[in-house]
Amino acid sequence: MLKSFCRKAAVLFALVFFSLPVFSVSAESDANRSSSYLYDSEGNVISAPQSYVYSNTVTASDIGTAEFGELVDIANDKEGNIYFLDKKNSQITVTDKGFKLIRTIKAFTNGNEADSFKNPSGIAISDKGNIYVADTDNGRVVILDKNGNFIGSIGAPDKKESQYVNQYKPSKVEVDKSDRVYVIAENQTQGIFSFGASGKFMGYVGATKVKPNLAELFFRSFASKSQKKASLQFVPTEYSNIAIDDENFLFCVISAVDGKALSEDIQSRNGTVDPVRRLNQDGTDITIKNGSFPPVGELTFDPYVYGSYAGASNFVDVAACGGGMYSVLDSKRGRVFTYDSQGNLLYIFGGRGDQRGQFNQPCALIYNGDEILVADRSRNSVQVFVPTEYAKLIKSAITEYNTGEYDKEYESWKEIALNFSGSELAYSGMGRYHYNNAEYSKALEYFKMANNRKYYSVAVKKYIAQIGRNVQPFVISGVIVLFIAFKLYGVIKKRRAKAPAVRRRTKLTRLSEELKYSWYIAMHPFDGFWDLKHEKRGGAGAATILLAAATLANVVFIRFKAFTFNTFDPEQDSAILKGIEGVTIIVLLWCVANWSMTTLMDGKGTMKDIYCYMCYSLLPVIIMLPIATVVSYVLPIEGAALLNMISTVGIIWMAFLVFCGTSATHNYSFGKTVATIALTVVGMLIILFLFVLTITLIQQIIAFISLISKEISMRT
């Protein structure tokens, strides 16, 4: 009989399980997503005004020269001249800012001999106007003046300087204001080559150390010396491109990023995976990551899916725009992501496709004034994008903040917010303005609108201190008045003292005593629970009131704790339902499961006894959650650990009372109590599973009946 029932249950479960639709959490399709969007502070995709719009496309025919063979890089100088690097034809095409041909550099004189490039991959222009070319297959960096005359070259470091260079093939090059040269070479993972102005090898910068997991450490402990030495050679990071900003720091990007690790990093918001880095002269990463998420490009992607449009962003270039702003180019989706100096995402534009403003194989980008130029390798063309008023306002606000023009900055953010109500960045900017003017209440409003909990926390501290200074005289006066009143009350009470009147024991009086008894139980759990059952010191009515109070405390904590620590969205969820789920449902599940288990384990408690001791055990929740709610309003964001500790103390205290209540009610030993609690938890999970299964079956039956009825109605 039992075997037959089990077989039927298993078949039924299998049918239901495999008939359920497969749900997957995925972002909006990349193919259908608008090219103008943003991510809010919760990682949700939101529509945003256009930041940069397509202006025109530049090809070799537009310049008036032979077709490009393979356009791989672009650069510009201080005069606005544009340099197009053609890898296949091994030449440089130079135009003015209007894309009129100035010259083509294909060959040059090196000493007394003719020389030329061989499959060059990268180009950079110094502040002096000199041209630096990563001459890949010749294994050197060629330096030319602005007219294309040979100045010199930088070859590979010798073996004494670098033991890791086997075949030196530079792919990207950059030069700073001091003429220090930085080179990325193919298949070199020790970092970026750094050369002095004279061409002397200075060492590597930006090398990334490996963080092996436990399995790698385990196998490494059994490896030989040669195996350990070999294992060091495959792990460091290989950069894909570099750029120098206006403060002479080095921006670099990484294209090969572990999608799974990056996805976990986005969820935790730790910023430990760094596809974008800003390095100082020592090679230390000084990238600021104060944004809601680290600067990683796309936030919503499937880390287990790979392909032309799937997975993490693939950064192939980076360009600095001044004022700490920078843009990175994602070749996977053809999008440009722009961030400010704090790591806040400002705007996104571009996309993959054949339309104007879209790319097939984007490979390089530069700023030319306010314009952004993006090179497309497969089309052998450059698309020019111009900023909209929205992008200009953002840049103006950032520039005005950097120069100390805070009133103008506020007006810029205000205009942005008027045209784009979803701009959390604008609300943060306005909140910062009010904060700097000591208008903390207004600052709190804007920081809350911006979902900026960090600055909200800082403003709360200032606001509380400001209120404290304003009400301090009234508080002192009130304390004095209360002290005097308390003393007078004591004197009057003594004078009017009489023999205690005989109290009449009513239902209300008994209920009050039963509620007060919950405190005795909290302080003396073993004696308290024994008397609760055997001396009838409590009742179901008081237990129900305690259950309702605990549920209410949970609802208030979920809904009304300070914004600094509160991620609850009343538009998406119900605090009442969450409060009931967190307390009432758990208590009821416990009662049913515990009664079921103790019935089989010679328990002495009835269902009423179990219900009473469980509800009386909730007093710590009733005490600690309101305390945590109030304390949350005076704690900074760094006080999250203290807030968690307060609620954790309540939960641990409650768990101890549940243990004592189970032991006293059922007259169990320590070991049997532990076993009963463990089995009760398992029973709760089974009941919950059966409940969900029943609901699912009912839904399937209703859907089936609905489908049949529709089919019948259509046939008739």
Stretch-by-stretch model annotation:
Residues 426, 459-460:
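TPR alpha-solenoid repeat register
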Residues 28-411, 415-433:
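Eukaryotic scaffold repeat domains enriched in small/polar residues
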Residues 480-494:
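Alpha-helical transmembrane segments
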Residues 460-478:
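Juxtamembrane/start-of-transmembrane alpha-helix segments at the extracytoplasmic/lumenal side
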Residues 577-581, 590-692, 697:
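Hydrophobic alpha-helical transmembrane segments and adjacent short intramembrane/lumenal linkers
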Residues 435-457, 483:
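TPR/TPR-like (Sel1-like) alpha-helical repeat modules
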Residues 508-608:
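Selected alpha-helical membrane-embedding segments in polytopic membrane proteins
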Residues 402-403, 436-437, 470:
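Register position in tetratricopeptide repeats
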